[in-house]
UniProtKB/Swiss-Prot annotation:
Transmembrane segments: none annotated. The keyword Transferase applies. The modification N6-(pyridoxal phosphate)lysine is found at K244. It holds the Pfam family Aminotran_1_2. It comes from the Bacteria. Signal peptide: none annotated. Catalyzes the cleavage of 2-amino-3-ketobutyrate to glycine and acetyl-CoA. Its cofactor is pyridoxal 5'-phosphate. This is 2-amino-3-ketobutyrate coenzyme A ligase. Pyridoxal 5'-phosphate binds at C111, F112, S185, D210, D211, S212, H213, T241, L242, G243, K244, S274, N275. The gene is kbl. It catalyses: glycine + acetyl-CoA = (2S)-2-amino-3-oxobutanoate + CoA.
Length: 398
């Protein structure tokens, strides 16, 4: 029986390779930044990191992290409720809550844990969760852990969301929660949060938003998609990460009203049974929020880069998804083509990743490019030139 198990895994791996669905992990030997070094020693320009503000290797963050270790040590060796809560953890939680316009916040090891520990803690079998079809895997998995009745609506489809809300209310749900990404990360599309909040008000539902791909750079002050959509104060729960725009290390959080956060501290299993966030990450994250609040220079640079890339790629004839975001997917359709395109781009000094099933639906393979404030206009033009050459070679564009 054990032999059959390993044989099955071997066959599955071989099938994934044969179908072009096997994900290779490429090695980076430098710090994460716009210009990186890979295993063969070559220098490439990175267009696939979540390093939106270009802060992953910023000297001010590195110095803040070092200072955090000097003052508070390397690790906590404890969960929060035993002996793993330092003053800096509370300071970061308060700063996150204030920045997001919420009453309180709670830190997790990752946003995956924040979402994984949210739904089953707050909702039960008498309740209902209505989830966008393109929500992140962490929301999907978190909802699966919950006993609440589950509904799903087509991506950003307000008519279908309203139909699901009616179903849930007619079925007698005690509490109804709408769960959505703030930005759908495979498409670079911002959720229609005004429509969601309007329907939530109409049907007396709660709204939860995972804003991992927005906080720090989306909205006038970088507060996220709820600021961009002018619904601050109308979203009940915001989850997010410290591992993308806010420094790119690790850590997640949930921000909400105080009673929600306090109940999560009492019952959320990933919070109760995971080590506290490391002091270096906490200190650097506080510094990041200070930098974001200090001015719009990095955000302005990011959006200028996104506009340049989208305009030049569209002019070259590529089909692009999304809008108004630093995620700009280049649609290719075929998984094998997406992988070959990515390999050829790396030879040209452009570092990207092909995305394909099961990460995206079959037939919708793509290269998801991500702009950074750290990119220069010259680097963006170089990337577009490489895309254009290879696109013509592979028959993607004329």
């Amino acid at each position: 029986m054990r032999g059959d198990f390993y044989k099955q895994l071997t066959n599955d791996l071989e099938t994934a390779r044969a179908e072009g669905l096997f994900k290779e992990e490429r090695i980076i030997t430098s710090a994460q930044q716009a210009d990186i070094t890979v295993a063969d020693g070559s220098h490439v320009i990175n267009f696939c990191a979540n390093n939106y503000l270009g802060l992953a290797n910023h000297p001010e963050l590195i110095n803040a992290a070092k200072a955090g270790m000097d003052s508070h040590g390397f690790g906590m060796a404890s969960v929060r409720f035993i002996c793993g809560t330092q003053d800096s953890h509370k300071a970061l939680e308060q700063k996150l809550a204030s920045f997001l316009g919420m009453e309180d916040a709670i830190l997790y090891s990752s946003c995956f844990d924040a979402n994984g520990g949210l739904f089953e803690t707050l909702l039960g079998a008498e309740d209902a969760i209505i989830s966008d079809a393109l929500n992140h895997a962490s929301i999907i998995d978190g909802v699966r852990l919950c006993k609440a009745k589950r509904y799903r609506y087509a991506n950003n489809d307000m008519a279908e969301l309203e139909a699901r809300l009616k179903e849930a209310r007619e079925a007698g749900a005690r509490h109804v929660l709408i769960a959505t990404d703030g930005v759908f990360s495979m498409d670079g599309v911002i959720a229609n949060l005004k429509g969601v909040c309007d329907l939530a008000d109409k049907y007396d539902a709660l709204v939860m938003v995972d804003d991992s791909h927005a906080v720090g750079f989306v909205g006038e002050n970088g507060r996220g998609s709820h600021e961009y959509c002018d619904v601050m104060g109308r979203v009940d729960i915001i989850t997010g990460t410290l591992g993308k725009a806010l420094g790119g290390a690790s850590g997640g959080y949930t921000a909400a009203r105080k009673e929600v956060v306090e109940w999560l501290r009492q019952r959320s299993r990933p919070y109760l049974f995971s080590n506290s966030l490391a002091p270096a990450i906490v200190a650097a994250s506080i510094k990041v929020l200070e930098m974001v609040e200090a001015g719009a220079e990095l955000r302005d640079r990011l959006w200028a880069n996104a506009r340049q890339f989208r305009e030049q790629m569209s002019a070259a004839g590529f089909t692009l998804a999304g809008a108004d975001h630093a995620i700009i997917p280049v649609m290719l359709g075929d998984a094998v083509v997406a992988q070959k395109f990515a390999r050829e781009l790396q030879k040209e000094g452009i570092y990207v990743t092909g995305f394909f099933y099961p990460v995206v639906p079959k037939g919708q393979a793509r290269i998801r490019t991500q702009m950074s404030a750290a990119h220069t206009p010259e680097q963006i033009t170089r990337a577009v030139d490489a895309f254009t050459r290879i696109g013509k070679q592979l028959g993607v564009i004329a």
